[in-house]
């Protein structure tokens, strides 16, 4: 072996192995599929192994490729840790940080916070994606998941960024037409706007009050996987919605929405979630603390407190 593989080629290979194709990786990196194919070919030539089986429909990793993938993952993690330790010494976070969040919260709250972070720490390179699904942080190469909801796997590290609750709400027009529910069981007979949240099963609202937890099955003619769509339907008087306080507090203050069954709520705190190997990462630690302070300063009424 005359040459050592380039770190960037190892990164490209890992992405291709995860995505099982060149086109998706090319789109993610902002390059052509031909460029991705060339980098893989050069890496195979350098290592003198076949890393991938290529067909017209998909790309699969070879047995040798699986071993190289494991080595590449360790090498890149070690390089990342080295850069983090340098950042600790310099007290300046630097390098790539891939962050993910949900659509609505990501667009409205997280994106402006990351813009402020980028201005404060220009040596950080931030990659921000939005997905309304739980991601596999390890296998999808995500450093930090900014998520809403308290159901977090025990093998992950979670740092609380802000207190938040989901509440039941509807428009004044809806209340005038259907009446306000007086008991939790009334929701079963009313049109509800159902959304697939990342942290709860579809069509089952798991709520709490002073007496403890409650679960209610709800239905309605309209449902979506996008919170902003459900929010707009709620404003349009199409049903009762279960939405985060950060999302509807201004509408409630303005009278465009009203809270129903106010004694019931759903805990949905905001967390920064990452894998254990990043516990000592300077850029993760500084980013988490920055976001915590940002939310406290820019969203002082983030939460609806419950006794």
From Swiss-Prot:
For this UniProt record, the keywords arranged alphabetically read as follows: Activator, DNA-binding, Repressor, Transcription, Transcription regulation
Question: What induces or represses this gene?
Answer: Expression of dmlR is subject to negative autoregulation under both aerobic and anaerobic growth conditions. Its level of expression is generally lower under anaerobic conditions than that under aerobic conditions.
Q: State what the entry records as the consequence of deleting this gene.
A: Deletion of dmlR inhibits aerobic growth on D-malate and inhibits the induction of dmlA expression by D-malate and L- and meso-tartrate.
Q: Which PROSITE patterns match?
A: HTH_LYSR
| MF (Gene Ontology) | DNA-binding transcription factor activity; sequence-specific DNA binding
Family annotation (InterPro entries): LysR_subst-bd (IPR005119), Tscrpt_reg_HTH_LysR (IPR000847), WH-like_DNA-bd_sf (IPR036388), WH_DNA-bd_sf (IPR036390)
Ranges for domain HTH lysR-type? 5-62
Its GO biological process terms?
DNA-templated transcription; malate metabolic process; negative regulation of DNA-templated transcription; positive regulation of DNA-templated transcription
Membrane-spanning intervals of the chain: none
Which positions does the record tag as DNA-binding? Answer: 22-41
Q: Which domain of life is it from?
A: Bacteria
What family classification does the UniProt entry report for this protein?
Answer: Belongs to the LysR transcriptional regulatory family.
Stated role? Transcriptional regulator required for the aerobic growth on D-malate as the sole carbon source. Induces the expression of dmlA in response to D-malate or L- or meso-tartrate. Negatively regulates its own expression.
Question: What is the protein's name according to its record?
Answer: HTH-type transcriptional regulator DmlR
- State the organism named in the record: Escherichia coli (strain K12)
Q: What is the lineage of its organism?
A: Bacteria, Pseudomonadati, Pseudomonadota, Gammaproteobacteria, Enterobacterales
Instruction: Give the gene name.
Output: dmlR
């Amino acid at each position: 072996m005359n040459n050592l593989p380039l770190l960037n080629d190892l990164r490209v290979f890992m992405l291709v192995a995860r995505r099982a194709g060149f086109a998706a990786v090319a789109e993610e990196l902002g390059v052509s599929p031909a460029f991705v194919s060339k980098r893989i070919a050069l890496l195979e030539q350098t290592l003198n192994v076949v890393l991938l089986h290529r067909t017209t429909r998909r790309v699969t990793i070879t047995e040798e490729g699986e071993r190289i993938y494991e080595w590449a993952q360790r090498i890149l993690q070690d390089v990342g840790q080295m850069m983090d330790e340098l950042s600790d010494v310099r007290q300046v976070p630097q390098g790539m940080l891939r962050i993910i969040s949900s659509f609505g919260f990501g667009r409205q709250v997280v994106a402006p916070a990351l813009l402020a972070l980028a201005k404060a720490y220009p040596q950080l390179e931030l990659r921000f994606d939005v997905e309304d699904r739980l991601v596999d942080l390890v296998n999808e190469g995500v450093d930090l998941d900014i998520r809403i909801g308290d159901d977090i796997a025990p093998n992950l590290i979670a740092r609380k960024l802000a207190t938040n609750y989901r509440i039941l709400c509807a428009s004044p027009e809806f209340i005038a037409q259907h009446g306000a529910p007086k008991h939790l069981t009334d929701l079963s007979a009313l049109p509800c706007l159902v959304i697939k949240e990342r942290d709860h099963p579809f069509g089952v609202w798991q709520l709490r009050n002073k007496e403890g937890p409650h679960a209610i099955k709800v239905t309605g003619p309209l449902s979506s996987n996008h919170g902003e769509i459900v929010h707009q339907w709620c404003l349009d008087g199409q049903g009762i919605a279960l939405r985060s306080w950060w999302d509807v507090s201004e509408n409630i203050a303005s009278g465009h929405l009203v809270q129903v069954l106010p004694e019931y709520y759903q805990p949905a705190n905001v967390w920064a979630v990452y894998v254990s190997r990043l516990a000592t990462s300077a850029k993760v630690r500084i980013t988490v603390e920055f976001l915590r302070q940002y939310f406290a300063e820019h969203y002082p009424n983030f939460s609806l407190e419950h006794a």
